[in-house]
A protein has these predicted regions:
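Periplasmic peptidoglycan-binding/tethering modules of Gram-negative envelope proteins
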Residues: 127-208
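Extracytoplasmic/secreted proteins, especially bacterial periplasmic and envelope-associated proteins
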Residues: 117, 189-196, 231, 235
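Periplasmic OmpA-like peptidoglycan-binding domain that tethers envelope proteins to the cell wall
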Residues: 216-282
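An ectodomain-focused feature that recognizes extracytoplasmic/extracellular
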Residues: 20-77
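Sec-dependent signal peptide recognition
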Residues: 2-12
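Short, solvent-exposed, Trp/other aromatic-anchored flexible loops in extracytoplasmic proteins
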Residues: 105-123
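Extended low-complexity, serine/threonine- and proline-enriched intrinsically disordered segments
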Residues: 65-97
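N-terminal signal peptide c-region/cleavage motif recognized by signal peptidases
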Residues: 14-16
Length: 282
């Protein structure tokens, strides 16, 4: 692989003579892997340029991102391409997508199908690359990823993508657990929603607080509503703790009927005013 990669870079010089090239050194190509239930990342440092990164965050699209510390773009466009490997007996390059760039842009990003195609191509020995005009160069620059040592990391990266949680932090950051009239038992759907919270909290060490707030409608006496509001928050807290969420992360408040979501004058409105609200903070 190393000899083939070296030969390929050599053969490319006449084709891209008008472009200043940035690429990992053949003998110094490294990969950095992040493998968690909420983030998968496979990145490669590129000397004198920055990094190239395949990645996905839970609940978000798969992406390919080039980030530069040294070569901000001119206003124009960046072309994402895939270059053929030399053993395929072809000097052709395949365009993936062309996107507009702003003056001074340092991050070049594609996602979804195009990014996944780039990963498939590099797995087959081809070379993902970008072209654009840099503020610090009189000619177009070309940035290539290397395939060297890729197979040492790719299987773990693919496994991480398979195991990635399917929902984002934003989807569980604000959650409403509803209750029936004068009840504080959790239904099956509510338990499923809370287990999503549990799994995310257990996977994300940056979460610092889970705030619970119990509510009631204005049906019944205040003393009874106070107990009901407390019990609704408590049953959610206990469910979280029973499934492994540390008590130190959880705060509890009881608002009774003081902060209604809808008017208490209708049955529908009162039904919406009986939740325990959950807000999660990083």
């Amino acid at each position: 692989m190393i000899k083939k990669s070296f030969l390929y870079y050599f053969l490319l010089l006449p084709l891209w003579v008008q472009a200043e090239q940035f690429q990992p050194a053949i003998t110094d190509t490294t990969w950095e892997l992040i493998n968690t239930p909420i983030e998968c990342s496979l990145s490669q440092p590129i000397r004198d340029f920055g990094t190239a990164r395949f990645g996905q965050i839970a609940g978000h699209p798969f992406s390919l991102t080039y980030t530069t510390n040294t070569q901000p773009s001119k206003k124009g466009s960046v072309t994402f391409e895939v270059a053929e490997a030399p053993w395929q007996n072809s000097e052709q390059r395949q365009d993936l997508v062309i996107i507009q760039t702003k003056q001074g842009q340092r991050v070049f990003h594609i996602e979804g199908v195009n990014a996944r195609q780039a990963l498939n191509h590099i797995n087959e020995g081809r070379f993902p690359t970008i072209f654009y005009l840099s503020q610090h160069s009189n000619q177009e620059i070309n940035v290539l990823m290397s395939t060297v040592h890729l197979q040492d990391f790719l299987p773990k990266f693919e496994t991480c993508l398979i195991d990635l949680l399917t929902y984002s932090f934003e989807e569980i950051q604000h959650l409403t657990i509803n209750f029936e009239l004068e009840k504080y038992e959790l239904g099956e759907l509510e338990k499923v929603a809370l287990m999503r919270v549990v799994k995310f909290v257990q996977a994300d060490p940056s979460i610092r607080k889970i705030a619970l707030a119990g509510h009631t409608d204005n049906h019944g006496k205040k003393r009874l509503n106070q107990a009901l509001s407390d019990n609704r928050a408590a049953v959610v807290k206990n469910f979280l703790m029973d499934n492994g969420v540390p008590e130190s992360l959880i705060t509890v408040a009881s608002h009774l009927e003081l902060i209604p979501v809808m008017s208490n004058k209708t049955q529908t409105g009162r039904a919406h005013n009986r939740p325990t609200e959950i807000e999660i903070f990083r």
